[in-house]
From Swiss-Prot:
This is Biotin synthase. Signal peptide: none annotated. Pathway: Cofactor biosynthesis; biotin biosynthesis; biotin from 7,8-diaminononanoate: step 2/2. It comes from Vibrio atlanticus (strain LGP32). Gene3D superfamilies: Aldolase class I (3.20.20.70). GO terms for biological process: biotin biosynthetic process. [2Fe-2S] cluster binds at residues 97, 128, 188, 260. Residues 38-265 form the Radical SAM core domain. It catalyses: (4R,5S)-dethiobiotin + (sulfur carrier)-SH + 2 reduced [2Fe-2S]-[ferredoxin] + 2 S-adenosyl-L-methionine = (sulfur carrier)-H + biotin + 2 5'-deoxyadenosine + 2 L-methionine + 2 oxidized [2Fe-2S]-[ferredoxin]. PANTHER family: BIOTIN SYNTHASE, BIOTIN SYNTHASE, MITOCHONDRIAL.
Amino acid sequence: MEVRHDWTVAEVRALLEKPFMDLMFEAQVVHRQYQEHNHVQVSTLLSIKTGACPEDCKYCPQSAHYRTDVDKERLMEVERVLDAAQKAKNAGSTRFCMGAAWKNPKERDMPHLTDMIKGVKGMGLETCMTLGMLTPDQAGELADAGLDYYNHNLDTSPEFYGSIITTRTYQDRLDTLSHVRDAGMKICSGGIIGMGESTNDRAGLLVELANLPVHPESVPINMLVKVKGTPMENVDDVESFDFVKLIAIARIMMPMSAVRLSAGRENMNEQMQAMCFMAGANSIFYGCKLLTTPNPDEDTDMQLFKKLGINSQQVAQKPDEIQENELLDQVVERVAARPTKDDMFYDATV
């Protein structure tokens, strides 16, 4: 099967209408052709700035527009981020993702963010950030610091998007992905299933992702986690087989990408997760929380992997020890040189 960038909604609809077992078989064949089977990459996600986001994404408990139980927090200290990254590495993660509830980072944020990247890289982990929209210069600055992946989801189809978010446009999201790609970083971009979208909208999301000039290296498929206080708290649940089908179709359409089984796993039983892995999912977030929503704990995931005979990816080749120590020393020196803790870790929500 060739890698394509010219998919249509009609083609995706045709895949959705296939018998379930036939679709699963096709996805598994593609998966084994392009990916290492029985292998799952493990990432950890940390919220480095939580709550009070000015965006109005209707699914998000961190939005300042809704009354939820999420408290706003300041930008996390670099030392705390590095401590969390070390714990994630010790638990088996190979990629450390850092998320901030912003519309976009301000220039005052950039030195702290680049220190986080360099410190985590110094541990031998891959790095990923999700910070909202980026300018070309900001993308270049993150890339120069060594950021491997940047996450910026499309969320849904262009047609349904305006029903979910009004504070940034679909084109804003596509522009940020272009800036990230132009800066030389890898892209993590996917969407959310279960927000009341139609079958055509689900197909349209996958078409948008698969028809990018280069497929995202990582495609997170999230199942909506309904949070009290958001406009999405009472939407209907996603039918399990429908969700698994979308994992399979993402694998078929983007065969070289990692398809990440992302938010919503806490609400999936072992059998549903196993079907998702069979359908081509080969990446998960590891740890008890995704930003502010629950996630299965590490022991539960390892038990499931053992039952299924799945191997989690081990930490990639460690950087040269001298280089690692130099990177960490540079970060510590820069942090120590800054005036005061209060000056450095301002309230990033203002």
